[in-house]
A protein has these predicted regions:
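Seven-transmembrane-like multi-pass membrane architecture, highlighting hydrophobic TM helices
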Residues: 1-323
Length: 323
């Protein structure tokens, strides 16, 4: 009985709570992004819009990242409850045997690059109006495919580098994402995500300045009508960008700095795990924003009392946003 009480007292309940939060936020992100992607694919007048298909590609990256937190949080919770969190393993074990590592490394890279591409898409939409209106689904599929191809190759490079690392048991079975890679790959991984996110935010600042200038100087015309329509989705995504900056980029940079300083500080306590929870909370906020706006856009095309009204309204909606 005494041994059992000692075993129970050794459980790190702070880490148990943190990993439950990981699972909760990760599960919320997965569920929310499935709803967003499903809504866009379900309604034809939504999936015919280039910018919304691009958003669905962005949400896929967040979904992968959230799934990594869901699986990884469950795995670590099991380890802490069974006193296995400090079992030594090699980085290669983390890369090859832990499912969550795949999502931890692939999801953030794909999500950050998609944020950058969405920013570039919005920049083209408000700057090169005529050119953007002529782009078709090939452009969107190509952009999303290029992002996920690059992210997959990038993950593959990390996988190969980890294979050639010494098989010494230098990490523990918790297998935090960057522990599975070489130091140089960890630097590249952090730099890629940070650069893509910050560049996307800078692009959005430029886009909002262009929109403000156009609003002040524009006059009634077909081009102005297109500008007004593009402004709606741009303002929606700008809310997501603001949320990303406050609750993703700043915590991400802080977490990266803590990782670099942990060699000197020794232990970051609860700060680092709570930053990860905050980062995932950003994805929850983004899900709420997108679902709120998609609900407004999906409603009109569904409620109709005319036999063919839905199809006619849908075609008008599509033609309106293709102009």
């Amino acid at each position: 009985m005494i041994a059992m009480n000692e075993s129970i007292s050794q459980i790190d309940y702070q880490q148990v709570i943190i990993n439950i939060l990981y699972m909760f936020t990760g599960g919320s992100v997965v569920f929310g992004n499935i709803c967003i992607i499903g809504t866009i694919l379900l309604f034809r007048h939504l999936r015919c819009r280039k910018e919304l298909v691009m958003v669905s590609g962005q949400c896929l990256g967040d979904l992968l990242y959230g799934f990594g937190f869901l699986v990884g949080g469950g795995r670590r919770l099991y380890l802490f409850l069974n006193h296995m969190e400090k079992v030594p393993v090699s980085p290669w074990h983390c890369m090859s045997a832990e499912v969550a590592t795949f999502f931890y490394l692939l999801g953030p890279q794909a999500g950050a690059l998609m944020n950058l591409f969405v920013g570039m898409d919005r920049f083209m939409a408000v700057t090169f109006l005529n050119y953007y209106s002529k782009l078709n689904s090939t452009y969107v599929v190509g952009a999303i495919g290029a992002v996920y191809l690059y992210a997959s190759i990038s993950y593959g490079v990390g996988f190969v580098l980890s294979y050639f690392m010494p098989r010494e048991k230098t990490v523990v079975l918790q297998c935090l994402s960057t522990w599975a890679s070489t130091p140089s790959y960890a630097v590249y991984y952090t730099a890629l995500i940070t650069t893509a996110e910050v560049t996307g935010i800078v692009l959005y600042v430029i886009v909002m300045l262009i929109l403000k200038y156009r609003t002040m100087t524009s006059h009634p015309s077909l081009q102005h009508a297109h500008h007004k329509r593009q402004t709606k989705i741009t303002k929606t995504i700008s809310l997501v960008v603001l949320s990303t900056f406050l609750f993703y980029v700043i915590p991400w940079l802080t977490h990266s700095a803590l990782n670099a300083l942990q060699v000197k500080l020794g232990k970051a306590g609860l700060i680092s795990p709570l930053l990860w929870v905050l980062i995932q909370s950003n994805n929850v906020f983004n899900v709420i924003i997108y679902l709120w706006k998609l609900q407004e856009r999906s409603g009109p095309g569904v409620h109709t009392h005319e036999p063919n009204g839905h199809r006619r309204h849908e075609r008008n909606f599509v033609s309106e946003y293709k102009s």
